[in-house]
UniProtKB/Swiss-Prot annotation:
Its EC number is 2.7.2.11. It comes from Yersinia enterocolitica serotype O:8 / biotype 1B (strain NCTC 13174 / 8081). The gene is proB. Its main location: cytoplasm. It catalyses: L-glutamate + ATP = L-glutamyl 5-phosphate + ADP. Keywords: Amino-acid biosynthesis, ATP-binding, Cytoplasm, Kinase, Nucleotide-binding, Proline biosynthesis, Transferase. ATP binds at residues 10, 169-170, 211-217. This is Glutamate 5-kinase. It is found in: Cytoplasm. Pathway: Amino-acid biosynthesis; L-proline biosynthesis; L-glutamate 5-semialdehyde from L-glutamate: step 1/2. The keyword Cytoplasm applies. Substrate binds at residues 50, 137, 149. HAMAP family: ProB. Catalyzes the transfer of a phosphate group to glutamate to form L-glutamate 5-phosphate.
C-alpha cells in the first residue's frame, strides 16, 4: 500500500514482565493488538522480543539454579518455545502468521550470513508474516552473543530496511538524569545527533531488569540513525504508543535519522558486532580522524580478541575511546605480529601479504 512503513518493535524484559517475575500476558495482549491494528493498515511489523529466560523460569516453577551460563541457557531452551507459542497464539487471534528468527553475533558479523538473514527477513515481510526475533540464548556464549536486544533490534532494523525502530521500556524516554533519583530530570523529546554529553547521561541511567539499560539503547539508536532509520524510546505502557510512532505523533524520545545515511555495505560494517578490537597510537588517530587515511600496521599498539581476515573490528585510541569500526585485512594473530612495523615489512614478517593496510578507509566507519 502507498505510505506503508516498516516498524521494528523491541520489547525488553521489563516491558514483558512489568517488573515482576513472570510474563505480563495482559500487557503483551495489548501490544499485539496494537501491532495487529497497524498490520491491518498495510504496515510491516517486526518484533524483537526478550523474555525467553523469564518464560523458562516461570514454566519450571522458579527452580533454584546456580548462577551459571549453563543455567541461563537451560532456562532459555525451555522458555524460547513457550515464548514463541505465546506470540503465535496472540497474533493468530488476528489471523496473522509469525516467523521465528533466532540469531547470534556470527549471523550478523559475517557478510554472507548477514545477507542471507536479510533475505529471510524480506521474504517473511513480503508475505505479510511478522518476524519474531530473539538472540539464540540457548546456544550463544559470551563470544558469540550480540549481548543485548537493544543492539540486536538495531541490526534487525537494518536487515528489514526499516523506516523506524521503537525501543519500548519502562521509562517514558531518555531523561536529562535518572528520574527515579532526580526529581528535576526532564524528558528529552528530540535528538539530532548523539554526542558525548548524551552518552554521559545515558550511562548513568538504567532501564528495567534485562541486560540493556539506556546506554545500550543509545548505542542502538546511533547504529540505526546512521543507517537512515528514525528511533523512538518510549514507555511500553503508553496508550497507543505503536500507532503514535507510525503516525509521527510526538511520544517518548525521538532520534532523527541522518539525512545522508550510510550505504548498505557500511551499514553492515557499523552495525555488525565487532569480533575484536585494536588500539592505535596518536599518529594513527590523526591520520584516521583528520586526514581520512587507512590504518597502517605501524600505528597499531595492541590487539584484543581472536578474529579472522574480513571480520569487523573496533578501533580505539590509547584512552580506550572508540574511533571507528572497520573490516580487518589480516587476522588477529597476523596483526599482533605486524603491530608497530612498517608496511614494507609485511611480507618479510608473515611470508605473505594482502596489501599495505590493516584496515582500508573504504572499509571503515568513523564513530
Amino acid at each position: 500500500m502507498s505510505g506503508s512503513q516498516t516498524l521494528v518493535v523491541k520489547l525488553g524484559t521489563s516491558v514483558l514482565t512489568g517488573g515482576s517475575r513472570r510474563l505480563n500476558r495482559a500487557h503483551i495482549v495489548e501490544l499485539v493488538r496494537q501491532c495487529a491494528q497497524q498490520h491491518a493498515k498495510g504496515h510491516r511489523i517486526v518484533i524483537v522480543t526478550s523474555g525467553a529466560i523469564a518464560a523458562g523460569r516461570e514454566h519450571l516453577g522458579y527452580p533454584e539454579l546456580p548462577a551459571t551460563i549453563a543455567s541461563k541457557q537451560l532456562l532459555a531452551a525451555v522458555g524460547q518455545s513457550r515464548l514463541i507459542q505465546l506470540w503465535e497464539q496472540l497474533f493468530s487471534i488476528y489471523g496473522i502468521h509469525i516467523g521465528q528468527m533466532l540469531l547470534t553475533r556470527a549471523d550478523l558479523e559475517d557478510r554472507e550470513r548477514f545477507l542471507n538473514a536479510r533475505d529471510t527477513m524480506n521474504a517473511l515481510l513480503d508475505n505479510r508474516i511478522v518476524p519474531v526475533i530473539n538472540e539464540n540464548d540457548a546456544v550463544a556464549t559470551a563470544e558469540i552473543k550480540v549481548g543485548d536486544n537493544d543492539n540486536l533490534s538495531a541490526l534487525a532494523a537494518i536487515l528489514a530496511g526499516a523506516d523506524k525502530l521503537l525501543l519500548l521500556t519502562d521509562q517514558a524516554g531518555l531523561y536529562t538524569a535518572d528520574p527515579r533519583n532526580n526529581p528535576q530530570a526532564e524528558l528529552i523529546r528530540e535528538v539530532h545527533g548523539i554526542d558525548d554529553a548524551l552518552r554521559g547521561i545515558a550511562g548513568d541511567s538504567v532501564s528495567g531488569l534485562g541486560t540493556g539499560g539506556m546506554a545500550t539503547k543509545l548505542q542502538a539508536a546511533d547504529v540505526a540513525c546512521r543507517a537512515g532509520i528514525d528511533v523512538v524510546i518510549a514507555a511500553g505502557s503508553q496508550v497507543g504508543v505503536i500507532a503514535d510512532v507510525i503516525e509521527g505523533t510526538p511520544v517518548g524520545t525521538r532520534f532523527h535519522a541522518l539525512e545522508t545515511p550510510l550505504e548498505n555495505r557500511k551499514r553492515w560494517i557499523f552495525g555488525a558486532p565487532p569480533a575484536g578490537e585494536i588500539t592505535v597510537d596518536d599518529g594513527a588517530v590523526t591520520a584516521i580522524m583528520e586526514r581520512g587515511s587507512s590504518l597502517l600496521p605501524k600505528g597499531i599498539r595492541s590487539v584484543v580478541g581472536n578474529f579472522s581476515r574480513g571480520e569487523v573490528i573496533r578501533i580505539r585510541n590509547l584512552s580506550g575511546r572508540d574511533l571507528a569500526h572497520g573490516v580487518s585485512r589480516y587476522n588477529s594473530d597476523a596483526l599482533r605480529m605486524l603491530a608497530g612495523h612498517h608496511s614494507q615489512q609485511i611480507s618479510e614478517i608473515l611470508g605473505y601479504e594482502y596489501g599495505p593496510v590493516a584496515v582500508h578507509r573504504d572499509d571503515m566507519i568513523v564513530s
